[in-house]
Regions:
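Generic beta-sheet signal
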Residues: 7, 47, 135-146
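Domain-level recognition of soluble alpha/beta enzyme cores
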Residues: 159-184
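Phosphate-coordination/substrate-recognition cap region in phosphate-metabolizing enzymes
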Residues: 37-98
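Glycine-rich phosphate-binding loop signature in dinucleotide/nucleotide-binding domains
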Residues: 2, 43-45, 129-138
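A polyampholytic, Gly/Pro-enriched intrinsically disordered region
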Residues: 88-102, 181-188
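Active-site signature of alpha/beta-hydrolase-fold catalytic machinery across serine-
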Residues: 63, 150, 154
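Loop-to-helix element that buttresses phosphate recognition and phosphoryl-transfer chemistry
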Residues: 4-60, 110-122
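Short glycine/proline- and acidic residue-enriched helix-loop micro-motifs
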Residues: 97-117
Length: 188
């Protein structure tokens, strides 16, 4: 097992839902083809590429590597009955629910997953990676911005509420390193 682990989280490409301020449906393709930029950016990546099962994440990952694994652990948060709906329409129809969603990590006004539930799932996924015996110890996880936020809050030990103040653009990335000897995560 390598002495350290390097996990790069990459936010998937933009989707039409993102461009039109809608909650995702989970089956959106990328709105633009960004393969040239990503191929150059990750040309020398030599680890495992793991994507959320969402088509946009799988397509983004396929622009980088010919061999891509998928993992439900890195799926988008479950937006429940809000899937596919315009954010403004939900805010108008259910202002209390939207307010709770934007301020309370345990809120699930849509009937799906709360931020706290997502964060627990991501913490478990990171623990699984820590115990993986991959030869390179390098991972590229292509996923959703909310998943990246949850991972960052977890490794930094930040309160989950910090997720509300984070913003990750499509195709932005962050690398998290884990020192197996010290048992410590750091933001690279």
């Amino acid at each position: 097992m390598p002495p350290s682990l390097h996990v790069t989280f990459l936010c998937h490409a933009a989707t039409h839902a993102m461009k039109t301020a809608r909650f995702p449906t989970g089956d959106e393709p990328p709105a633009y083809d960004n393969r040239a930029a990503l191929a150059q950016r990750f040309a020398h990546f030599d680890g495992r590429v793991i994507a959320s099962p969402a088509p946009v994440a799988r397509a983004t990952a396929a622009w980088i590597a010919s061999s891509v694994e998928t993992s439900d652990a890195f799926s988008d948060i479950d937006y429940g009955r809000w899937r596919g709906h315009a954010i403004r329409a939900i805010a108008d129809k259910d202002p209390e629910g939207m307010s709770a969603w934007l301020t309370n990590v345990d809120a699930r006004p849509h009937g799906g997953e709360s931020i706290a539930m997502l964060s627990e799932r991501i913490a478990n996924a990171l623990a699984t990676l820590v115990h993986d015996d991959a030869r390179t110890g390098r991972y590229l996880i292509v996923t959703h911005a909310i998943v990246v936020k949850a991972a960052l809050a977890h490794v930094r030990g930040d309160p989950l509420e910090s997720i509300f103040a984070m913003d990750f653009a499509p195709l932005s990335s962050i690398t998290l390193d884990y020192d197996r000897q010290r048992g410590v995560w750091t933001v690279a």
